[in-house]
Every structure is written in structure tokens, then in C-alpha cells.
Amino acid sequence: MLFSFSTDFLCFLPELFFGFFSCVSLFFYSFFSGAKQRFIQKTFVLRDISFWLTLQVLFFTLLLLLNNPASYTTFFFGSLSFDIVSFYGKILLFFFILCVFIIGQTYFYIKRINSFEFFVLFSISCLGLCLMTQANDFLSFYVALELQSLCFYALASFKRDSAFSVEAGLKYFVLGAISSGIYLFGCSLLYGTVGTTNFSVFSLFFSNNFVGTIPLSGFVGFFFVIVGFFFKLTAAPFHAWAPDTYEGAPSFVSFFFAVVPKIALLVVFSRILFVCFYSWLFAWSHLLLLVSLFSVFIGALGALAQKKIKRFFVFSSISHVGFIFLAFSNGSFFGLSSAFFYLVIYLFIVFSIWSFFLFF
């Protein structure tokens, strides 16, 4: 956990590049939009510049990820981790971000999204998702999660002339704040039990030799952390915010919500279960099994009663999350690999379906 500038810089280079150019883009857009232009189609020119500049930054960030010479290690005093899971998780994440963004180009033209703020919020939320995949600490994960969530709240209510969209963003904000509070409460209990928030230390502390000596606050804190993840992953019965949010948000934003965030969340969720608390398999396997059964049945039955396509897709995703949790509850490497194989296939299917219905 020592600080080494060269190692930490190499590990963090793609995120540093992406974050730096996101800030540069924000300053450039602000200057360009505030300048007194003589031509009429200034907003349309700004939209084109915003789209292509964001696309190039995403593409070069993916190239940096693929050609990163750093070796697998933890950096920034153990708060972030560069390992095979985070590496392939970020590759998968940016691949689908690029695919979603390219598909959305026509949507931006049709819906006349001419505000550069949309592209800045999109970029910063992608940066938060990228940081989430390599989080090795409960607090670093929370900071990355809030960076992503604050942008998501604004994106969900981006149609300011639609009261339905503003309502969706407000619901998402309120329930997102509640889920973050539940997660932080669990983290505080775990910190009081162990004295740290680092995943690596948790994996050593919560070993089989110490299970009998752990106070009740440790189990309660673990439960609240897991419930916070259930909220974010729209697992039943913590899914109430999702249908209204997806329906009220712009179609491209719902498309983005449905495909990309689950990658980062499931990577961190698997790291917490199989690294920090694997010795508690007897406890969380039954909890995941129960939630997975709830999600499968509520997702399947709830979808039958829907009359709008967005709400139907939301309940479908709830059911699929249940199947992924079912594989997690197995508690073995085969269950974990099966879950991520299912996730990749699910992402391609959802991407294809949303791409078709994006313009309806």
C-alpha cells in the first residue's frame, strides 16, 4: 500500500487522460457557447463538436486501457486495484459505452439535443463507472459511485420541458440518496468492527479463524452494504424506483442505464462477496438465493402487466439480475464465471433490443 508515483501514474493513466480531457472539453464548450457567433446554427455546430470530441476521447481511452504497460497491483495506498478483473471489466465497460454512444448519434439529431452539458455529464458518469470497476476500498467505491450517480440524476431529468422527466429524475435522486445512506451506514458499522475500509484487509480479517469472534455489528454492517447494492442493481424487492425512472428519462439515457452501469456494479459486488466476505458464504449465499428468486418471479410476472415498452424492459432486467444472483449464490468459481458469461450475453441482447426501440 506504499505510494509509488511511477506505478500509480501508469495504473491511473487512462482515467487521468479521460478525466483531464473531460474537464478541458467542459471549458472549451463553455467558451464556445458563450462567444458571440454570427452564424445561426451555432448550437448545431456545438452539438457536432461535442459528439465527435467525446467519441474521440472515449476511443483513445480504450486504446490506453488496451496498451497499459502497468503490472497488476494496488495503488493510491490500496484504495484502487489494477488486476485482471478490473482490466477486463474496464475493457468491457468502454466497449459498450462506445457502442451505446455511437448508436445514440442519430437520436441526438432527431431529438435535437444541442446542449453540450449532456455530453459532459455523460463523460463524467463514464469516468465514475471506470473508477468503480477498480475500487479496492469501500470509500473509494462510494466516491466513484456518487460521481456516477450525480450525473445520472441530471441525465434522467434532462428533458426540462417534460414534467414526467423531472419527476423521474427526482425519484431517482431521492431513492438513490436513501440507498447511498444505507450503504454508508453499513460501511460505518464495518469500519467500527475492523478499523479499516480496505477490501484486502477485510479478506484477511474475516477469515475462517475469526468468524466466531466477530461482533454483531459486523454482520449488520455487511447486511446494509449488500442491501445498498440491491438498490443500485434493481433487485427485487428494492426495484420500485426503476420503472418510473426509466420511463420518464430520455430514451437514450434509459438505454445507457440499462446496459452500462451493471458491469461496474457487478464487478465490485463480486469483489466484495468473493474477496472480502467469502468466509461468510453460509450467510450471503442464502440471502442471494432468496433475492434472486424474488427478482425472477417479480420480474417475470410484473412484465406481463406492463403496457409500455420501457417498463417492460425494466422488469425484464430485474428478472435477469435474479438469474445472475442465482449464479453468485453458488459460491464457487464456476458460479462466478457463469454469472459473468451470462452478463456478457445479456448485455449484447439488451444492447440489440434497445438499439432497435431507441427511436420509437
Q: How would you describe each model-predicted region?
A:
Residues M1-F360:
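Alpha-helical transmembrane segments of multi-pass membrane proteins predominantly involved
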